[in-house]
Amino acid sequence: AIGXQPAAEAEAPFQISLMK
């Protein structure tokens, strides 16, 4: 997910919580 990688799906929950 970091850097808009294609594997963002795996870090979706983490990214959403961080950006929240």
Swiss-Prot record:
Domain Peptidase S1: 1-20
Protein name stated in the entry: Mite allergen Der p 6
Alphabetical keyword list: Allergen, Hydrolase, Protease, Secreted, Serine protease
Keyword Cell cycle: no
EC number(s) given by UniProt: 3.4.21.-
Any one annotated GO CC term: extracellular region
The organism of origin for this protein: Dermatophagoides pteronyssinus (European house dust mite)
Protein location: Secreted
